């Protein structure tokens, strides 16, 4: 990711400005909730970020035609919440989450973030990354978890959740546990544990064990392959997807499967995410 033209942190910094300019419109959160027992599939737009920069309406139209049911934002490409909601509605898409910096959830920024996401119909406010020191020790994990617990209480009355997304570095050991497991052991059940299967395995973690250890905490989960040939899409590497789905559908409390693809091989990003969805459908999803 370090060589990307647009880093996740750069994308998030752009999101702050979009939130700050939001008009006071609230359209509710119903659009984000799946209506059937089957878990719907969304796409993390970071997977196709350069295409989104060039032509976001075209990308949303394309992913909807592929069969994706929702999208998770990682930046808003200079558009207001009203504009984004209109584009989603035009394409029959739901907002299944947003990746937003911790700074957008604190202090005076929180109200604007809530308002922006209410307009999108999104209840899931997911912090995608934190500096290493936030989870570097038992005390750091406890202190950071307290921040998330307090935020979870603040947004609960709005029908919303805060959460944290897994990166490889989160699975380094702190004592006899991974930083990830230690952090979530201090978090309240209201804090969403957004596992990223590929990132976890890349960091030496065990995503299956974490899903079992924290039942009901994985309201959204990132589906990402690990291993296999260069640019392997979901189903083409070493992940035990049958086990992932079984855990999500029995104990995880999962409301959304979210595809995130960051390696493309000889495919374009849009071709890669289409391939991921095709493979998921072959697996019965």
Positions of predicted regions on the chain:
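Active-site acidic/histidine proton-transfer and metal-coordination neighborhood
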Residues: 16, 23-24, 69-70, 77, ...
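Histidine-centered catalytic micro-motifs
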Residues: 43, 162-168, 221-223
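Active-site-adjacent beta->alpha loops and helix N-cap segments on the catalytic face
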Residues: 78-83
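Flexible loop residues that form catalytic
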Residues: 46, 76, 103, 130, ...
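A short, local hydrophobic-aromatic micro-motif
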Residues: 41, 69, 96-97, 123, ...
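Histidine-acidic metal/acid-base catalytic patches
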Residues: 2-5, 9-42, 48-64, 174-192, ...
């Amino acid at each position: 990711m370090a060589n990307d033209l647009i880093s996740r942190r750069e994308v998030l910094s752009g999101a702050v400005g979009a939130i700050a300019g939001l008009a006071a419109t609230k359209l509710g959160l119903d659009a984000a909730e799946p209506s059937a027992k089957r878990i719907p599939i969304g796409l993390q737009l970071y997977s196709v970020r350069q295409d989104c920069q060039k032509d976001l309406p075209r990308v949303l139209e394309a992913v909807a035609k592929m069969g994706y049911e929702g999208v998770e934002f990682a930046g808003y490409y200079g558009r207001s919440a009203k504009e984004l909601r209109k584009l989603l509605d035009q394409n029959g898409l739901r907002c299944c989450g947003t990746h937003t910096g911790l700074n957008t959830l604190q202090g005076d920024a929180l109200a604007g973030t809530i308002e922006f996401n209410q307009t999108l119909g999104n209840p899931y406010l997911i912090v995608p990354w934190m500096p290493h020191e936030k989870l570097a020790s038992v005390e750091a994990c406890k202190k950071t978890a307290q921040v998330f617990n307090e935020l979870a209480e603040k947004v609960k009355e709005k029908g919303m959740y805060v959460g944290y997304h897994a990166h490889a570095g989160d699975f380094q050991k702190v004592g006899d546990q991974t930083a990830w497991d230690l952090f979530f052991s201090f978090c309240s059940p209201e804090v969403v544990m957004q596992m990223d299967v590929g990132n976890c395995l890349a960091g030496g973690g065990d995503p299956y064990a974490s899903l079992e250890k924290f039942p009901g905490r994985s309201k959204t989960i990132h589906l990402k392959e690990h291993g296999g040939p260069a640019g392997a899409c979901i189903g083409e590497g070493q992940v035990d997807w049958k086990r992932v789905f079984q855990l999500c559908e029995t104990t995880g409390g999962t409301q959304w499967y979210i595809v995130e693809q960051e390696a493309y091989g000889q495919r374009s990003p849009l071709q890669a995410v289409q391939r991921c969805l095709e493979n998921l459908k072959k697996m019965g999803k």
